[in-house]
């Protein structure tokens, strides 16, 4: 049964939205809690494609915005997902699809955190509740999913380059179609966005860029560019329509609607700007405007559509708009999990178990502990203070914490520059985003063998965010770089001590650890320094004189999976008496423990299996193969059967982490099956 947005009754914290009528003015609804039942959305239910919007009046569009916002609230409660950014672009999404003729006109979303409303209006309304789940809708726009998703995204700052490419190709083919790129102020801090804008002016391309300025990326936007946008806002409208007709006469948006800025920026006298960055580089500039005012958006976007050459429309929005808790805490509500079931039975309290730490928390604890001991430690993050576990470090050591915004290339070379002056920089970065700073890692850090440590978070399969965020290529692109040393801890305690080991090393190092919680291992003190390039035999199962001897070489958090798989094989009636198993925690991808490999070969190992949460091609198993084939003395005389277990040569679709592991044969059952095939 559907619930009307006009009649929802408050039932519990998660049960319903605030009861109030949908106005036909531009005063949007604000809801207090997330509805459990599908809301009543008569206007939205009439929209199966953007073409259906053409019959709506402006008043209908305003009312539709409330219905769409409530529907996104409901759907996010069912499936979880990115939240605040989606609520902030409801009106913009409606205005774009009303004015443009998608899919002939091209709409390009940057990052994709804000594309849920776009998915709803483009025929995917009834599947939005499946978003991020296995075989459901993807978390981001994806070309294979819909003709309306013009460019696949997930990383930031790509939209203007992609949109410019579309515009130039359309011009070359003589096709008159509008290309509109939507980019946030956080993504605009990425250098790639400015490279594209510079080229758009050079090419005199017909390109519309919409700057969705909510003073946030995932957390608060920072830096000189963010301050420049604030000055544009506080100085009033800077409307340039010299190529588009008469000046737009409209009121300045209510400052109180965006008073969150006052919490982030020092009050100051603001000059009346006669020019701005966008106009200075050659864009026609409209703005700033209220991004929640549909009539105003329709007027401005209609004019911008008529402009020849590159044009930028600057709008202000509120992240989490219309959901009171998200407006108050936009960082906390950047993304949410699904709501708990109402009928969840209360759990019987047992002896309280200490919760497992997230690996990002382990890193944060190490940072704070080490910073007390060593005043040379400096920490850098490209806009991932919260996600990387650095909030407490930033609070305790603000002068040693550097958030460089979404600028991975800069972050890596910044660390290199710091290292030349006798300090020890640590770059905390997600594996998938380190790819964006690869040239800098090689040219600016490793080539000079500078003393920089990389703390690589979100390594391996990351679950619902899917292939765009998977960290499954780092072993391959790091281990081929001279001077680079790579560690892969099996649990929280080992992560802490490997972080310390790499910190104490003079040179380029990387510690790679996964998303989420660990195994529950207790972190021991004081911090240890492990032997570099030395593995640990975790267990030996089976009879010493068994005819088959398997060495299971596990990297990182796959050690626990390897141990469970080995125990199952040791109990197997078919293999228990015929196979001895060595479970090895390799710890290091580079340098490998080649001494241990030689010892295992000399002991008569008949089978070797490598296990990693990384692509098989180029991964740690490949490193073992290369050593055995090229450098091992023992392997020339004794050649065991070899199996590499890891991620196959394909992008792994979104789903839960456990579903992804099973899909790749990296769950315990999958590993056992592959080992049994090897031993058969």
Swiss-Prot record:
Pathway: Metabolic intermediate biosynthesis; 1-deoxy-D-xylulose 5-phosphate biosynthesis; 1-deoxy-D-xylulose 5-phosphate from D-glyceraldehyde 3-phosphate and pyruvate: step 1/1. Its cofactor is Mg(2+); thiamine diphosphate. Thiamine diphosphate binds at residues 113, 154-156, 186-187, 214, 323, 408. Binds 1 Mg(2+) ion per subunit. Binds 1 thiamine pyrophosphate per subunit. It is an enzyme of class 2 (transferase). GO terms for molecular function: 1-deoxy-D-xylulose-5-phosphate synthase activity; magnesium ion binding; thiamine pyrophosphate binding. It holds the Pfam family DXP_synthase_N. InterPro entries: Dxylulose-5-P_synthase (IPR005477), THDP-binding (IPR029061), Transketo_C/PFOR_II (IPR009014), Transketolase-like_Pyr-bd (IPR005475), Transketolase_BS (IPR020826), Transketolase_C (IPR033248). Gene3D superfamilies: 3.40.50.920, 3.40.50.970. It comes from the Bacteria. Keywords: Isoprene biosynthesis, Magnesium, Metal-binding, Thiamine biosynthesis, Thiamine pyrophosphate, Transferase. Its EC number is 2.2.1.7. GO terms for cellular component: cytosol. It catalyses: D-glyceraldehyde 3-phosphate + pyruvate + H(+) = 1-deoxy-D-xylulose 5-phosphate + CO2. PANTHER family: 1-D-DEOXYXYLULOSE 5-PHOSPHATE SYNTHASE-RELATED, 1-DEOXY-D-XYLULOSE-5-PHOSPHATE SYNTHASE, CHLOROPLASTIC. Homodimer. HAMAP family: DXP_synth (MF_00315). Belongs to the transketolase family. DXPS subfamily. Catalyzes the acyloin condensation reaction between C atoms 2 and 3 of pyruvate and glyceraldehyde 3-phosphate to yield 1-deoxy-D-xylulose-5-phosphate (DXP). This is 1-deoxy-D-xylulose-5-phosphate synthase.
């Amino acid at each position: 049964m559907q619930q009307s947005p006009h009649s929802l009754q408050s039932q519990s914290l998660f049960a319903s939205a605030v009861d109030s009528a949908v106005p036909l003015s531009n005063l949007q609804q604000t809801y207090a809690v997330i509805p459990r039942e599908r809301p009543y959305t008569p206007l939205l239910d009439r929209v199966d494609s953007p073409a259906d919007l053409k019959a709506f009046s402006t008043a209908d569009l305003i009312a539709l915005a409330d219905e769409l916002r409530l529907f996104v609230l409901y759907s996010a409660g069912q499936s979880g997902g990115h939240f605040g950014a989606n609520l902030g672009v409801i009106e913009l999404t409606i205005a774009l699809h009303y004015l443009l003729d998608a899919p002939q006109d091209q709409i390009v979303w940057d990052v994709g955190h804000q594309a849920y409303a776009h998915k709803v209006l483009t025929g995917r309304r009834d599947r939005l509740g499946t978003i991020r789940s296995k075989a459901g809708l993807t978390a981001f726009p994806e070309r294979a999913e819909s003709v309306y998703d013009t460019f696949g995204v997930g990383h930031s700052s790509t939209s203007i380059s992609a949109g410019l490419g579309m515009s130039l190709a359309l011009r070359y083919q003589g096709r008159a179609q509008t290309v509109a790129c939507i980019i946030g102020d956080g993504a605009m801090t990425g250098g790639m966005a400015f490279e594209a804008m510079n080229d758009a002016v050079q090419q005199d391309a017909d390109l519309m860029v919409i700057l969705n300025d909510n003073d946030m990326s995932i957390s608060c936007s920072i830096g000189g560019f963010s301050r420049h946008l604030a000055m544009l806002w506080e100085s009033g409208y800077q409307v340039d329509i010299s190529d588009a007709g008469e000046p737009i006469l409209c009121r300045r948006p209510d400052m109180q609607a965006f008073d969150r800025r006052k919490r982030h920026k020092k009050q100051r006298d603001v000059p009346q700007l006669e020019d701005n960055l966008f106009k200075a580089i050659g864009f026609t500039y409209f703005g700033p405007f209220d991004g929640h005012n549909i009539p105003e958006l329709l007027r401005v976007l209609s004019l911008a559509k008529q402009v020849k050459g590159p044009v930028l429309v600057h709008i202000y929005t509120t992240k989490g708009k219309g959901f009171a808790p998200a407006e108050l805490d936009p960082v906390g509500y950047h993304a949410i999990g699904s709501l708990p079931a109402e009928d969840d039975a209360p759990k019987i309290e047992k002896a309280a178990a200490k919760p497992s730490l997230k690996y990002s928390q382990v890193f944060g604890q190490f940072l704070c502990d080490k910073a007390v001991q060593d005043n040379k430690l400096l920490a850098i993050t490209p806009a991932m203070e919260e996600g990387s576990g650095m909030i407490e470090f930033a609070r305790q050591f603000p002068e040693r914490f550097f958030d460089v915004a979404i600028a991975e290339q800069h972050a890596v070379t910044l660390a290199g520059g710091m290292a030349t002056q006798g300090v020890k920089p640590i770059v905390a970065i997600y594996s998938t985003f380190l790819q964006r700073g690869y040239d800098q890692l090689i040219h600016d850090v490793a080539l000079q063998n500078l003393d920089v440590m990389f703390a690589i978070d979100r390594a391996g399969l990351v679950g619902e965010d899917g292939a765009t965020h998977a960290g499954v290529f780092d072993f391959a692109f790091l281990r081929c770089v001279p001077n680079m040393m790579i560690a892969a801890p099996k649990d929280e305690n080992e992560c802490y001590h490997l972080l310390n080991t790499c910190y104490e090393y003079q040179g380029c190092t990387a510690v790679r650890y996964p998303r989420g919680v660990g195994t529950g291992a207790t972190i021991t003190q004081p911090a240890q320094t492990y032997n570099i390039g030395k593995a640990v035999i975790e267990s030996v199962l089976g009879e010493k004189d068994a005819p088959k001897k398997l060495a299971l070489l596990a990297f990182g958090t796959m050690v626990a999976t390897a141990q469970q798989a080995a125990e199952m094989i040791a109990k197997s009636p078919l293999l228990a008496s015929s196979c001895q198993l060595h479970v090895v925690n390799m710890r290091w991808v580079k340098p490998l423990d080649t001494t241990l490999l030689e010892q295992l070969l000399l002991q008569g190992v008949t089978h070797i299996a490598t296990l990693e949460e990384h692509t098989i091609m180029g991964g740690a198993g490949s490193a073992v193969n290369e050593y055995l084939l090229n450098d091992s003395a023992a392997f020339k005389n004794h050649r065991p059967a070899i199996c590499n277990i890891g991620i196959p040569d394909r992008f792994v679709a979104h789903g839960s982490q456990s579903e992804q592991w099973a899909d790749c044969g990296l769950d315990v059952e999958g590993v056992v099956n592959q080992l049994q095939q090897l031993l058969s």
